[in-house]
């Protein structure tokens, strides 16, 4: 038994399921999860000392690579001055100014401690600002584990939402409507059936929680138009795409201006940080300037602010955005080419520094239903083959994978060599 397996058994005695976030348990792929001892650059090292080229990157934040010296030193320096004050600091101002400069639609913003907190707060603000209760999300998009967002579609496009987790009251979930990603008609139908009742649309501009699904042409433009016509706010959940799809986020990549934006992951440089912000008119509606209440003891934590500021300052250096996108495209194109050489049907999507692949005969993947039709068992087999070859991908067919600026040509080529061998095994097994 490996040390990771031993630790997993031990963890289950005191931690539900042995993990502090469900996807880490490998339920989506089977087997025992890797317990990480340390990480550096493009690599993680498990409790048994084995190295893996990492394409999870702590689920997105490690865009500069693990254990970056500049971020590490920023954290040490900040920690020496104190770990938490519960009072304003100058670094909060510097961080807010930098984020607003990089993402201009965020005229004002507030720091929080997680992406879930950011989306939860943005939705409360949208409801308070519009005076409406209902919100519209998309099937397969994940916006954190707040009650109003753990909702799935009903049996038809116009039915009330149903809780996707016990503990979420059905009476509460009924205020959340669920449309089909990349389908504007489904959005229009819900607005028509709930005239004047929908406060906002919240969307992952590139869906990263049903693997990696970009918007079809005109989708985001259509959402912007519908919100303008109906008096609803458009919220871009850029917790995953922020600074990764482009330096200014997916909204810069697709040239769309949302009313509110939520951020997380990259913004903290590896520390627990989130943020929400948008039009000044809307943000002024939040306490203490407005009636919508939101607060947090650790919001704007000085150590986390120092890490995030160092990360974004490095990330904005000239050439980094293009380098990240270029190496990710090279990797994605390589996966697609190698799969084709071995007769393995594979759809590969890539935007900026995120990518995903689907074992399927379908020509393209545009929504959650398409993902459910993919060969999930073949994904599980490929995942474990890649683990055996020293490559760590997202342990779920419904999660995107990520590159970092620390992934050099050596790591990319080693990954493609491993994929070549693994595709060959899959092809042989299917004969």
From Swiss-Prot:
The modification N6-(pyridoxal phosphate)lysine is found at residue 265. It holds the Pfam family Aminotran_3. Its EC number is 5.4.3.8. Belongs to the class-III pyridoxal-phosphate-dependent aminotransferase family. HemL subfamily. Keywords: Cytoplasm, Isomerase, Porphyrin biosynthesis, Pyridoxal phosphate. Pathway: Porphyrin-containing compound metabolism; protoporphyrin-IX biosynthesis; 5-aminolevulinate from L-glutamyl-tRNA(Glu): step 2/2. Its cofactor is pyridoxal 5'-phosphate. GO terms for molecular function: glutamate-1-semialdehyde 2,1-aminomutase activity; pyridoxal phosphate binding; transaminase activity. This is Glutamate-1-semialdehyde 2,1-aminomutase. It catalyses: (S)-4-amino-5-oxopentanoate = 5-aminolevulinate. GO terms for biological process: protoporphyrinogen IX biosynthetic process. GO terms for cellular component: cytoplasm. The keyword Cytoplasm applies. It is found in: Cytoplasm. Homodimer. It comes from Vibrio vulnificus (strain YJ016). NCBIfam families: hemL, PRK00062.1.
């Amino acid at each position: 038994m490996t040390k990771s397996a031993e630790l997993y058994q031990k963890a289950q005695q005191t931690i539900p399921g042995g993990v502090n976030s469900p996807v880490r348990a490998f339920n989506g792929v089977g087997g025992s999860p890797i317990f990480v001892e340390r990480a550096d650059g493009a690599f993680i090292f498990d409790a048994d000392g084995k190295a893996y080229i990492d394409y999870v990157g702590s689920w997105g934040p490690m865009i500069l690579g693990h254990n970056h010296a500049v971020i590490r030193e920023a954290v040490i320096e900040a920690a020496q001055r104190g770990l938490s004050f519960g009072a304003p600091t100058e670094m909060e101002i510097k961080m807010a100014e930098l984020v607003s400069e990089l993402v201009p639609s965020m005229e004002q913003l507030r720091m929080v401690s997680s992406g879930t907190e950011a989306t939860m707060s943005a939705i409360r603000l949208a409801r308070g600002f519009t005076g409406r209760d209902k919100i519209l999300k998309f099937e397969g998009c994940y916006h954190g584990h707040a009650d109003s967002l753990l909702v799935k579609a009903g049996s038809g496009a116009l039915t009330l939402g149903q809780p996707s987790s016990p503990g979420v009251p059905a009476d509460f979930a009924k205020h959340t409507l669920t449309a089909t990603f990349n389908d504007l008609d489904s959005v229009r139908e819900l607005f028509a059936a709930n005239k004047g009742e929908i406060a906002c649309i919240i969307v992952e501009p590139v869906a990263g929680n049903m693997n990696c699904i970009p918007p079809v042409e005109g989708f985001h433009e259509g959402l912007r138009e519908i919100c303008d016509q109906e008096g609803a706010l458009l919220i871009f959940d850029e917790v995953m795409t922020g600074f990764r799809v482009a330096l200014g986020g997916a909204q810069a990549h697709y040239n769309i201006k949302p009313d509110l934006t939520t951020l997380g992951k990259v913004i903290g440089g590896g520390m627990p940080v989130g943020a929400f912000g948008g039009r000044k008119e809307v943000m002024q509606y939040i306490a203490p300037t407005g009636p919508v209440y939101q607060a947090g003891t650790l919001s704007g934590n000085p150590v986390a602010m120092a890490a995030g500021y160092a990360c974004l300052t490095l990330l904005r250096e000239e050439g980094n955005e293009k380098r990240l996108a270029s190496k990710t495209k090279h990797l994605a194109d390589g996966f697609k080419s190698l799969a084709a050489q071995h007769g393995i049907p594979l759809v590969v999507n890539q935007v900026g520094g995120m990518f995903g692949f689907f074992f399927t005969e379908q020509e393209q993947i545009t929504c959650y239903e398409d993902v459910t039709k993919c060969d999930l068992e073949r994904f599980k087999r490929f995942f474990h083959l890649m683990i055996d070859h020293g490559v760590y991908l997202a342990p779920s067919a419904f999660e995107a994978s990520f590159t970092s600026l620390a992934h050099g040509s050596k790591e990319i080529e080693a990954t493609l060599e491993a994929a070549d061998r693994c595709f060959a095994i899959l092809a042989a097994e299917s004969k």
